[in-house]
Structure formats: C-alpha cells, structure tokens
C-alpha cells in the first residue's frame, strides 16, 4: 500500500492504531535494554593514542620494541613547600622527598617495577652519596647541608667544572628543568671558597620531579599506576609533619580528570539543555502532550544510539559528546514538523491514528530525503584517517536514524495511545501567519538585494578566515581553569626555564631486506650532523655554558661521547675518540668497533646517567639494539627533549624533525621514523585538518549525489545544497572573527552545519514544491511555505539554538566554544534556508518558465 490515497491512509491508520500499544512497549523495552548497557555510564576516551592515525612509524616502533624496552611515559610533579615562602631545598625537605621517592619505588617494586627512572633532586643527591661517600650513607643520615657536602666534596670549587662540557650540560639541564627560576646556589660556592665554613644551603621556591613509567604497560595499566602514585603522594603530603606539597600532571591523569569531572559537568549541562528545550516546546505548542511526547521519544533515541554503540563494543571518544546535541537538534526538527502537521490533520478527523498517518504522508518525502542525505553526509567521516572520527560519523548516522524512528513511530504511537485513552487533547501551537506575509513581501521586493548581500558576506567570510584559524589539540582544553591539574600546569610553566618538557623519538632501522645497519664510520658522521642540527633548533632543550653546544637528548651518539669522556681507555679499546665535542674514529678503526663498544656498555652496571641514576647498561638498552650475534647495530632510538606549549609549536617541531629524518635517510642508507607523544599530537592535528577538509567536501558531494538520485533533478539538488555550503563558510568566518580555532569538537561543526542545513533546506524546498504542484503561484506558494514549514523551522531552530547556548555555562573552554559555534551554525543554517533558499527557488521557477 502506498501513502497518499485516502483508502491506503485509512488502512494504515487502522493498523497503526492497533500497533500503538505494542510500539510503545517495544520502544520502552528497547530503551531499558539500551539503558542497561549504559550502566555504569561509559567513559569518553581521551587517550592520545586513540585519536592518532596508524602510520609506518607505528609498525617500526613495534619492530623495535620486540628487542628493546618501549619508550617511557612521563609524570610531572611540581613540588612546593607547604609553608609559603619556605625553601624547597632545605635538608629536611630533601629528606622527605627522598622518603617519598622511596615510597614510590616500593610501590613500583610491588607492581613489576613499572617505574623505570626518576629525575628528582633527592635521587641525584643519593646517587652522589652512593658514588662518593666512603660510608655509603643516605640523605636521612645528615643534619645539615654542610655535613652532606663534606661527605661528597673534596677540594672542588664551583669553577672546577669549566671545560667539562658533560658536567656543565648535566648541571644546566638540572637547573633549567628541575629547579625554579629563582634557584640560588651562591651559598654553596661561598662555602667552597671559604674552606667549608658557613651555611651552604641552596634555595629555590619549587622543584620538579619527573617519574618515567614503563612503556610496556597498556594505557589502562599506566593510568591505574599513575593514579596510585598520585594518591600515594597526596596522602603523604597531607600528613601533619609534611613539609612538601605535590601537584601532579600527566596526559593519562588529564584524561582521567576529563572523564571524571568534565563529562559529569556535561551531563548536567545536557539535562539543563533539555529543560530549556521543554520550556520552548511548551511555549511553541502550549500543550503538555506536545511537549512530553517528543521529549520521551528523543530521550529514547539518545539511549538507543549510545546503548547500541556500547553493545557493539565501541569505545566512546570525547567526540561522542557532540552526538547528543546533534541528535536532539534533528529529532526536535522532525517532531515539530510532524506535530504541527498532526495538529492540522487532527482538525479534519476524529481519529488520532489517521491524523498522524496523514501528517507523515504530507512530510514523508521531505523527511525521507533529509534522513537519507544527512546520514550519508555523516558517514563521510569514514574517510578520516583518525579512528575516533570514523566512529563519530557512524554514531551520528545511527543517531539520525534513531531520531527519525522515535519521532515518526514512537511519538506517533504515544499520541494515538494517549488520545485514545485520555480523550482529545487541546492543541494550540504558535501561529506565525503575519510573519509569513512580511517574509514573502520582503522576498518579492528584495530577492536580488538578499542574494548580493549573501555573496558579499560569503566572500568576506572566506577572506577573513583564510590563514586565520589554527588547529589545536590540547587535552587540558577540556578542563576548567579552576581545576587543580590546570593550576599545576600553569604553575609549572611559570616556575621553570624549560617549559612543557616533551620528547621526540627518532627510530633508525636497516633498509628493507637488510638485517643490520652498515657503514659505522658514515653513520657516526650523520649522527654528528644531527647533533649539530639539534643544537641550533629552536625548541630543542640545549643546556647553556658548554664549550660546544650539547642538546639534551639520548641516543648512541651522546652515549658514546659520555662513555669516552668518562673513561678514555674505553674509547681506545674501540678506536673511538672525542674531538672538540664530536665523536670520531681513531687509527685502527674497523667496521664492528661501534657495535663492540655498545656490547661492552650493555654489560656495564656502573652509573652512566647521574640525573636519572641509570647504569650504562640500562641507558644503552633504551637506545641501541644489536643483532642476535652482537656484532652489528640493528636498531637505534634517539630521544630528544623539546619544549612545546601549544599546537603551533608542535607543528613547527614536527616539520623540523621530518626534514631531519629525510636527510638522515639519504646520508646513512637507513630508514628513519618519528614517534613520541609530541609526534602523536602532530599526527592528530594533521588528521583533524585533513578530516575537516575531506569530510566537508565529501559530505556535500555525497549529499548532492543522493539528492539527485532520489529526486532525479539536478537543478533543485544544487539549489538545496548551495545554502548549506554557504552556511559552512559563514561559520568558519564567524570563528575567525571570534578567535575560535579548530579543535577536536569544533572540527565537527561542519558536520553539524551540513546535517541541520540539509534538513532545513529540504523541508523548505519540498513544501514550496508541494504548494506549486497544488496550483499556487510562486509568491502564494512561498507564503504558505513560510506559514507552515517556516514556522516549524523557526521553532525547531530556536529550540536547538537555546539548547546549544546552555553549553556556554560550562567551565570547560572547548565545550563553551562548541556551544557558541553550534548555535551560530544553526542560526546561519536557518537564515540561509528561510531567506536565501526561497529566493533561489523563485529564481529557478522564473528560469524554468523562460523568464
């Protein structure tokens, strides 16, 4: 049976009336099942690795980690005295720090040694005591700094390090990374110069403690261990006799705080948003049933959407936050159109079922076109290289379908069931006939002016937005400025000379088909070039005061240099030397000498890294892997310390390192890849840009193809799509004017604009077409469209805008931005659908008539 004829509508209405109760029961059961799947509420994954696209570097890193320890992950701890203005380097504070460090080590030892290293002032002092104190005492055994220094200092002076680049580099790194900018070590120098007389206590307002966690752990394990460390240190810091306070930050902890606090905040915002929607629907329809039915239906649709994805085993990313407002926006639109048509049909029949079927019959083509086109537009996100964006597109498409089913079937069944049992409900929805007259008259007089204004605004938007919008991906953007983790991060940025310490890993492996790296002499030359380049790169940490620049990184090159400088006979045994800060070969060098030097270091348990307290063997194992027979180099890893506070700096660093790896591959005949958290962030940024451009273009293209296929008319299809594209450009221009950049949520605004824009445009076009087919002239058809569809769109768009505006109450910057930009997007989509599209449709009619 086809809808449209009175007989078929009456038969379907009879079936629908009988099925109303089963439909409501089935919807309720489906909602309960979906709701149970959402209990407890799912977490929104914010782990960096979940956003990153798969690259060749991932495969290379997997090969390397088969024979080498995985790169570590860092926890940053900002340590300040509990007493304001106190000295964090007082011996008592250092003793507590040593005790707390030991507690962390005990926790690590009880959990498979998940801590691989510490950068910690107390640890450095303990290493010095282990190496130089004849009695092998610990910090706790001393009462003053003078006693401690007496045990490790002989006849040294502060000036003794001059000329010792390694010592200066270590000290400079420690000062810039670990100690507050106000660090004062003059008392130590004066004490040394005065024959160990006086108080040598150095001073600083704060110190940094970096804990490096094993890279072998999964993200969940790493988070669990990070939380254990945070809980342990916070408990110890709140003890009555504690002299220190700890502020702890890491990407894992930031993700956890987002899941625990920000998403809870968002749930309340969404509930408030729904409350606002209820008030606006009540104002529009002035009927409890007209408010309750769509609200229940859309709540069910949201539960079906999220519940279905959970049952499929899909992990939600933070992007899925945006699904709810999109589904609500589209669902409200479907419901308002259907309910207004239902009101009109109800005046002509006593059967609520027949009235609902007739309302759907009138709107079925517009609704079907809208749902199919919008769903395909969202599915275009499958083109994205970022896995979460693929899932986001699928979730949105499912949400559109759920909203359609709930709005047409469930809401209709509720109306039929309620009116069947409780009697006829009074419907007095808002009417806008006078506004329709004014809008039509405006179009008749000013169509050309409107189109010219739109063209000018679009051109201005493009000009303003070109080069103005940056892409950002900072996990901390999802947290409010008043949250502890943000306060700690800001304090760290202000306190230390090296801000936002991060690392970039360079992985070097043999060419495909080769089992080892060959040409050790040439390899050393290439590594020397890299060492020189790193020394002059803007964002690479380079300690000051050395005779030759020594960038802060670890790898085979600085490893060999440090080993040779620490023991000249080591270099002689392997025909290697350090010449003016550069590692080179000496007489007698042959292929394999570098590998033999590495083999020796892999068995050396002496301290090889004073800052972290690692042995030569531990340090070497992290950076070099030999072939199974131990005679050649197989894999190399270089871990470079860099600073990057924002996405712009991240992109610049990634570009510099990419150029460097290209030169390295050409020079050494090897394969080189980049990895590390900073590169991960850059890959996400690049993926977001690509996704935004490709998905927008593809969404519009797919939408056009679907419309042409369904309508078999290219003219109207182009007319429908044009305002949607214009709305997208206007939104981008508005973002540029407001200073809002692309981030992981606002990047989705084009999907929202396309989804709602197509829906609005199809409703306007379809109603205009129906009115024309019924014999109305161009302007009468437009007036009728404004009176019916236009009024419905004003209600639905106004409701959606107010719902999004509630997000401005969020303390979270990116959610506020998303709420504002979404509201602007809906407003632009509405303006273009009601002011521009009617003029284009009228122009098309005149063109079709040969005028």
Regions found by a protein language model. Name each.
Residues 259-316, 367, 383-387, 694-740, ...:
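Interfacial segments of transmembrane alpha-helices in multi-pass membrane proteins
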Residues 326-347, 367-369, 373-374, 404-411, ...:
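Short helical (or helix-break) motifs at transmembrane helix termini and adjacent helical loops
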Residues 2-274, 278-289, 421-697, 846-851:
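Feature of extramembrane
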Residues 280, 312, 368-418, 704-708, ...:
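Hydrophobic, glycine/alanine-rich multi-pass transmembrane helices and their short helix-loop junctions
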Residues 1-2, 347-357, 407-437, 778, ...:
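Feature of multi-pass inner-membrane transport and sensor proteins
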Residues 22-30, 268-273, 277, 298, ...:
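Hydrophobic alpha-helical transmembrane segments in multi-pass membrane proteins
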Residues 257, 261-268, 295, 334, ...:
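Pore- and gate-forming transmembrane helices of large, multi-pass membrane proteins
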Residues 278-282, 298-299, 315-336, 379, ...:
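Hydrophobic transmembrane alpha-helices
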